[in-house]
Amino acid sequence: MIQFSGRACLRQGWKCAAGVGLRCHGAHSSPPLHVPPFRRYTATYSRADETGHIDTAPNESVFYFDSVLPVKALFSRRFAPLDLAPSMTGRIGNLIIKLTGATPLNVIGRAFPLELQENIQQVIPRYSEGGAFVKLSHPPNMDKEGLSSLLNTHLEQNPLKLWFSPFTSVRASLVRGRPWLEDLQRSPSSRIKVEFLPTSPGASSVELTPELLYSLSRRYGKLADIIPQPSDSKIQPRYALLDFTRPSYAVIAKNCLHGYKVSASEGGGSAGTLLKLSYERKLKPHVIRGWIVSHPRIVIPIIAAVIAAITVIVFDPIRTFFIKIQIAPPIDVQDNRLWQWIQRQASKANDILSLRQRQRSDSRGLKAIWEDRKEDIQRLQTWLLEATNTFTVVHGPRGSGKKELVLDEVLKGYRHKLVIDCKPIQEARGDSATINAAAAEVGYRPVFSWMNSISSLIDVATQTLGANAGLSETLDSQLGHILQNTANALKKVALEKKRWDGKDSHMTDEEFLEAHPECRPVVVIDNFLYKANNNPMIYEKLSDWAAALTVSNIARVIFLTGDISYSKTLSRALPNQIFHEIQLGDCTPDVAKQFVLDHLHTDQSNSSSYTQAGPDTIEGGDIKDLEDCIEVLGGRLSDLEFFARMISRGQSPSDAVHDIIVQSAAEILKMYIADVDNTVRNWTPEQAWYLVSSLAEAQGGSILYSEALFSDLFKKDGESTIRALEQAELISVTTLNDRPSTIKPGRPVFAAAFRRLLEDDVLRCRLGLRTLGQQIAMENANINKYEGELQVLGSLEKEPKEIRPRVRWLLEKLAGSQAKIEKYEKESVGLRRILQSKM
C-alpha cells in the first residue's frame, strides 16, 4: 500500500509533478523515509492491507477515484498461480505505473482543487480495479457532502481524461460505507451481489426493495437491471443482484456502498440493515467448459476447422519455403570448387584411414555410354526447351541407366530441378510412413503425420455420439496437400526471373510462364509405376499433379519407368496428347566392353593400397575372354558395373561372370519359383518354371508371345500373368506394331542363368513333376466336365439327332484329354526315375 503525506512534504520543501509537496511513509517505520526529488513515491504496506479497512477520524472522509490506473485486473487472475508476495506485487505495480507515467499521485493531484490539495492524507491505489482511495481531512466549516460537491464541481469544470482512457473522465465518489480492501483473486464484473445483513449479532435485517436499491446505487452509474432474490429461495442471508451497464460503474458502487448501514428512516428496518457488496459472475463457474462437453457435435467440427486454419495460415508458408529450398538451393555447393576440393580431401583421408579403395560414384566409366546415347541426350534437351505441354517419358529396364542419363547428362546445367523417387513411397508401410516418405522426397516439413492417428481415434469416439468430427484426413487428401504445396513452390521458382527482372513486369504470371519455357523447373519422377498393384492411388495422384503442372506451364515433368504400361496411366491424366518417349535398351557389345575397360582404368588410377586387375592386365592377357564374358553378360549397365567391380578386386573375367550367373540363378529360384505366394503374386511356380525352361531351350533366346499364351498353364488369365512376370523383371516382352511379339529374359544374364537352372537335374525333375501334376489335374477337371455333360445328354429318353455332333465333339475332347494324361504320366515316370537316381 502507498501512503502520501502532504503537509510533511511541504515542511521538507519538496515539490512533485502535481505541484503538491509530498513525503512517503510506511505504517511500520517510525522515522520518516526521505525520498529523492526525482523519485515520486515509495511502495510500502500499511495497516489497511492487514485489516482490509481504512480507519478515519471524525474530521476525515474517504473518496474513490475511478480510471486512475491504466492496468485493470492485473493481479486478479493472471498471476494467480504464482502466489506473489505483497512486496513483489508492489514492485510490479510501481514498475507499470512508472513506465506509463500515470501514477496515482499525478492523477489525483490534478483532480483536486488547489485549496484541497493540502488536505490529502492518504492515497491507496487499487491496481485490480484501476482506481484509488483518497483519505482527506475536512476543511473548516465543510462537511463530507460539501466536500463531495466541491470535488464533483471541479471535475465537471475541469474534466481529466488520461491517455489510456480518452473517452472516460476521472470521477470522484464519496465512500459512504466501510470498504473492504481485499487482495483476493477476484476480477471486477458488471454484476454486484448485495447481501442484507444485520447491523449487530442477534438483530434482524430487512430485504431492501428494488426502488430503494435503485436510489442508493443509481448515482454511481446506469443500471441495466435489478434482480431480487426469488421469494421461494431459502438461501440466507437474503440478497439482490445489481446489473450495471459497465463494469466501471459496478466497481464504484461496490467500493462506495460496501459496509453501508441503511437506517430505519431510509427503509432499513427498525435495527437497520448492513449492505455487503461483492462481484458476481454472470456466467456460472465452468459453464463454458460444460457447454463444450455437452455439445460435441458443434464443438469438434469447429476445433477441426480452427486446426485446419492454423495449419494453412502458419505452417503452409513454412512448408512451401522448405520445398522451394530443395528445388532451388540458395547456395549450390555441388558446383562450388571449394566444396569439391573438401570432398576430395575427405575421401583421400578416408582411404588412408580405412586402408581400402575409395568408393566413387556410380558414374565411373559412363563416358562411352553417353557417347553411344548422345542422340537421346540431345533429343531430351531439345524437348525441354520446347513450348509443348506434354510429358517426357524415359522407359527402360532396371539398371539401364535412366536416372544417370537424365540427371547427370540431360539436366547437367539445370539448377532448378526436383527428383521424386516413388520407390520409398511405395515401400512405406502404413499411412503415416507413406506421408513421411512423400514429404521427404519433396522437402515438405514440418510433418505431423502422427496427428492423423490421434485424429482417427477422436473420429471413432465421436461417431459413437452420432457425429463425425472430420479431424482425420485420408491418405489421398494428405498427399494432395503435399503436392499442392509443392506446386506452389515450383510456381514461385518459375517466376523468380520475372520478380528480379523488370523487363516482363507487364505480363501476368500465366503469360510469363508460357513465354519463357526455359524458366520452368524440371520435375523428375523416378521409379514410376514401381509396384503399381500395391497402391495405384499414389500413381494416379502423381500423374494428375504432373498433368496440372504441365498444362499450367509451371514445370517440365520427366517420368523414368520400367513398366511398359505407363501410357495407360499417363493417358488418363493427360488425354489427347502425344508423349515424348525415349526407349533405353542394353548396350552393344563394343560399348559394353569400352565401359568395362574405362571402369577398370578409373579403378586402377585411384588404387593406392593394393594391386588390382586393370585394363593393361586384361589387354595384355586374354582380351578374347573378356569379349566372350561380355557377350554372355549382355549390355545391362548394372550387371556390367558389378562385373567390372569384381574384376577390379582381382577376379578373372570368366570367374566373375560365373559368379554373376550363379547369383542370378539363385535369385531367380528364390524370387520367382521357390518362395511364391499366390495370394500376393499373380503367378504360380509352375508358370514361372515353364517360361524359364522354354527360354533356356529356345533357339535365339526368345519364344513367341502366342506360344506361351496358348500353353495349358496360361489358359486362365494368361496375359495378366505374363504382364505380372514382366513387371517382376523375370521376362521382357518385345512389341511389334504396338502388339506383344516375343518374350525374352528380363536381363541378358538371365539367359545363362536359365540354362544353368535347367542343367540341374534334381531341380528340373522336381519342378517338371509339379508342372505335370498340375497339367494332369487340369485335364482331369476337363474330363469330369465332359463326362457330366455326356451324362446329362444320355439321360434323355430319346436321343435327338441334333445332339449327335455335340456328343461326338465331347467324346473327341475326352479322348484328347485322356491321351494327354497318359502322355504326362509317361513323362512323370521318366522324371521320377531320374530323380531317384540322383537322390
UniProtKB/Swiss-Prot annotation:
MF (Gene Ontology): RNA binding
Keyword Lipoprotein: no
Mitochondrial matrix compartment spans: 43-297
GO terms under cellular component: mitochondrial inner membrane
Location in or out of the cell: Mitochondrion inner membrane
Transit peptide region: 1-42
Mitochondrial intermembrane side: 319-839
Residue ranges of the TM segments: 298-318
Keyword Hydrolase listed: no
Keywords carried by this UniProt record: Coiled coil, Membrane, Mitochondrion, Mitochondrion inner membrane, mRNA processing, RNA-binding, Transit peptide, Transmembrane, Transmembrane helix
Family the entry assigns: Belongs to the YME2 family.
Protein name: Mitochondrial escape protein 2
Organism: Coccidioides immitis (strain RS)
Gene name linked to the record: YME2
